[in-house]
């Protein structure tokens, strides 16, 4: 927020201007800025103004790249090195051109969205989003059995900046969770039937696929068992809260007394500058030309 984003050098953004005015009150001062997305910062020319009092805040002296701590889960960990073929943490929703996956989500969440046209299309959820929700539910089970039953769990859904879209998605996610819990209660014990094949087998297939990809693998714990997990899923699903964060509603709140399992839906306010507790699954379809926004 302290970066002066005005195009003309003699124009200054509000926060940048106020920080400069504070520094002018002292004969000796130093301004140190920290950023996780150092894109615009490195192109600032601190000597652009003729008057030293009007010079920008940084980086007139130096820029230092801090060493990441061992427990930092950042872009290099998520995406891997540049020559990596794929990341174990990312499942692409679509390739560059065409494919089943792209058609899956684009029917509901097109890249270009207009409020009056798009919102009425959200009468269901794409298969990929349902799978992401299922994986989040699996994660809660695994964490509960690893001693984190009192810790929060979160999932992020960011597919639109339209408030009306957030509301439509929230309704469909809530409906999906209710239906999923009912289907597990009704059909989990009916192996070999068409109902089991329709409602339970997709969960089992996802579970097996994730195990093959080293999901929930740890030398300290046994691999989870699907049937044991299945019996606990209805209670886990009923514990999940679907919240939103946007200009009209802010219902993403975590309890200070017990575990909160949160599916957070939002747009710009949720994409950057918002702390989500123990985030384990993100369903992300953001389209932006700004490098820092994309990285955030």
For each predicted feature, which ranges?
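Conserved C-terminal RecA-like helicase domain
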Residues: 1-10, 128, 142-263
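Flexible loop/turn segments at secondary-structure boundaries
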Residues: 2-4, 38-43, 49-50, 72-75, ...
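C-terminal, active-site-flanking charged/polar segments
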Residues: 55-64, 174-183, 280-296
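Conserved P-loop NTPase catalytic core
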Residues: 2-142, 154, 188-197
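A short beta-strand element within the Helicase C-terminal
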Residues: 262-265, 270-287
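Generic recognition of flexible, low-complexity loop/linker segments
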Residues: 18-22, 28-29, 51-54, 142-146, ...
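Subunit-assembly interface segments of extracellular/virion macromolecular structures
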Residues: 1, 33-34, 262, 267-269, ...
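Secondary-structure transition/capping motifs at alpha-helix termini
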Residues: 22-29, 147, 179-184, 276, ...
């Amino acid at each position: 927020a302290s970066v002066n984003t005005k195009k003309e050098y003699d124009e200054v953004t509000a926060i940048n201007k106020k920080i400069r005015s504070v520094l002018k009150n002292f004969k000796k001062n130093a301004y140190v800025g920290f950023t996780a997305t150092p894109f615009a910062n490195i192109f600032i020319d601190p000597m652009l103004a003729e008057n030293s009092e009007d010079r920008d805040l940084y980086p007139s002296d130096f820029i230092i790249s801090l060493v990441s701590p061992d427990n930092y889960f950042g872009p290099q960990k998520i995406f891997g090195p540049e020559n990596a073929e794929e990341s174990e943490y990312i499942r692409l929703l679509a390739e560059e051109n065409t494919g089943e996956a792209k058609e899956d989500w684009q029917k509901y969440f097109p890249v270009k969205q207009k409020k009056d046209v798009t919102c009425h299309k959200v009468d269901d959820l794409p298969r990929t989003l349902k799978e992401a929700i299922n994986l989040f539910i699996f994660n809660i089970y695994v964490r509960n059995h690893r001693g984190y039953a009192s810790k929060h769990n979160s999932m992020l859904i960011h597919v639109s900046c339209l408030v009306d879209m957030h509301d439509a998605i929230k309704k469909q996610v809530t409906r999906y969770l209710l239906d999923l819990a009912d289907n597990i209660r009704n059909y989990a014990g009916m192996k070999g039937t068409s109902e089991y094949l329709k409602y339970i087998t997709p969960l089992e297939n996802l579970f097996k696929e994730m195990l093959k990809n080293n999901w929930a693998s740890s030398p300290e714990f046994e691999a989870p068992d699907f049937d044991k997990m299945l019996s606990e899923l209805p209670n886990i699903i009923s514990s999940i809260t679907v919240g939103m964060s946007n200009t009209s509603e802010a219902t993403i709140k975590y309890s200070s007394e017990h575990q909160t399992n949160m599916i957070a839906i939002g747009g710009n306010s949720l994409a950057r500058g918002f702390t989500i507790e123990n985030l384990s699954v993100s369903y992300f379809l953001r389209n932006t030309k700004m490098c820092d926004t994309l990285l955030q």
